Amino acid sequence: MRLRLPLLIAILSVAFSIGGASLPEQTVWSGLIIATNSPPTEPTPAEVTQIEGTLRKLFGYSQFQLIGEARKTLKTGEEDWLASSKYFSLHVDSRGEKADAYVLNLKLFQEQKLLLETKARLSKASPLVIRGPQVGDGQLVIVLMVQ
């Protein structure tokens, strides 16, 4: 009996430590950006400044204006959220985590019209950047990144 009690305590403590382990909370930033070559009208936001060089190389534009954004802290990896601006909105539905990336269902709307619906993987190591439609003399750019 004396041997069984320590063994039972050891088994239960291992079971609780394994079962009670949870994923660390992480915040995802989502941004709707208008990229243009017009003169700057306002300073570039900090989130955009982090990847401004990449955006310039990818799209060839020199100015980036943040028109909508959202931050969501992921606790289970299966949350959803909305980043919106006056005319565009991005609905993000996180479907869980696989191999150091979040699996996302993305829907981009212009007012009520669905423009894009896709599945994507958001790596924890690098941002997800999507070229959107032409807007005036610029381009809509969608950025999601784990902070």
Q: Where are the regions a protein language model picked out?
A:
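Positively charged n-region of N-terminal signal peptides that target proteins for export
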Residues: 1-4
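Bacterial N-terminal signal peptides
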Residues: 6-17
